[in-house]
């Protein structure tokens, strides 16, 4: 069984037992959270789409860890003008383990 969930402005296809990194969620480590924005639920060949959400469906997950992704470097330069600008960004994430899909 799998589900398509929406969290942090992104969509993820998840199954029970998987781990995934999502945008940071303010929750403690080992806390159980419920993701209610389920867009689709499928099992085998049958799939149920929501309009836009599947009513009564939810995904239970456990917070495994919090962290930061690898640094994305930004470099701007104007040729022949001796202008260089360096920058960087590291996005925070929350790693979740999917425990159950309730449809």
UniProtKB/Swiss-Prot annotation:
Pfam families: Ribosomal_L21p. Transmembrane segments: none annotated. InterPro entries: bL21-like, bL21-like_sf, Ribosomal_bL21, Ribosomal_bL21_CS. The keyword RNA-binding applies. GO terms for biological process: translation. GO terms for molecular function: rRNA binding; structural constituent of ribosome. The keyword Ribosomal protein applies. Part of the 50S ribosomal subunit. Contacts protein L20. Belongs to the bacterial ribosomal protein bL21 family. This protein binds to 23S rRNA in the presence of protein L20. This is Large ribosomal subunit protein bL21. The lineage of its organism: Bacteria, Pseudomonadati, Pseudomonadota, Betaproteobacteria, Burkholderiales. The gene is rplU.
């Amino acid at each position: 069984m799998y589900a398509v969930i929406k969290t942090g402005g992104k969509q993820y296809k998840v199954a029970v037992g998987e781990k995934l990194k999502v945008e940071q969620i303010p929750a403690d480590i080992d806390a159980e959270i419920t993701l209610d924005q389920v867009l689709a639920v499928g099992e085998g060949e049958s799939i149920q789409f929501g309009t836009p959400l599947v009513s009564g469906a939810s995904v239970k997950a456990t917070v495994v860890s919090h962290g930061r992704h690898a640094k994305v470097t930004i470099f701007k330069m104007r040729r022949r003008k001796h202008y260089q600008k360096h920058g960087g960004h590291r996005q925070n994430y929350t790693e979740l383990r999917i425990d159950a899909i309730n449809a």
